[in-house]
Amino acid sequence: KLHVGETVRRAIPTDGIPFHPRWRKIERKRPQIMAICDVSGSVAAYAKFLLMFLYALQDVLPRTRSFAFSAALGEVSDLLATLPVEEAIERVNLKYGGATDYGRALQDFSELALAEVNSATTVIVLGDARNNQADPRLDLLGEIKSRARQLIWLNPESTRLWGTGDSEMLLVKKECHLAKECQNLKQLERVIDKILSDRR
């Protein structure tokens, strides 16, 4: 069985190409993944890391659907599946980069994909939850949580910054099954392995 966490961790330094697949003995059913990635200016320092994660995850877990946003959200699964990693990241940033509005993004996600979220779906949000004082639409986040197997929020900011300034993270984490700081490969691998091992 493919060890997805280790493979993704190893793939990111090689531009998302899983040259060194790792295998585990325990058979596990692969979950359906929907990943929502913030590519706004406030996460500019981490945007490539987050998009590399999407690129590698989609490569090793074919049932992954990927979405990107700053305000308006759109699906980027085809871009990540068909283009070289650097070109895919450039296209995503060009199309979806800008000022952040999580409420708008969650509304768009609800219209595009909420009907397909069910007890077999893990939804991952990658972003800093900084929302420019706009309405974060916690109601929509709660609706996603109620439908999904897991709702996981990965924040590239240190936990000591959560809730400071325009960060909505302290409110957001109450609507998630799991909320974690994620700014390096080791943290990322732990979360991915949890996604695969958790049988709620």
Report the location of each language-model feature.
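Negatively charged sequence features
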Residues: 1-31
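DG-centered beta-turn motif at the end of beta-strands
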Residues: 8, 36-40, 121-133, 177
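…and closely analogous acidic/polar surface helices at protein-protein or active-site interfaces
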Residues: 31, 36-68, 72
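Short acidic, S/G/P-rich loop/turn micro-motifs used as interaction or catalytic elements
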Residues: 42-44, 73, 130-133, 160
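Charged helix-capping and loop-helix junction motifs
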Residues: 51, 136-142
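Short beta-strand-loop
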Residues: 68-90
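Von Willebrand factor
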Residues: 76, 87-121, 158, 164
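Von Willebrand factor type A / integrin I
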Residues: 142-200
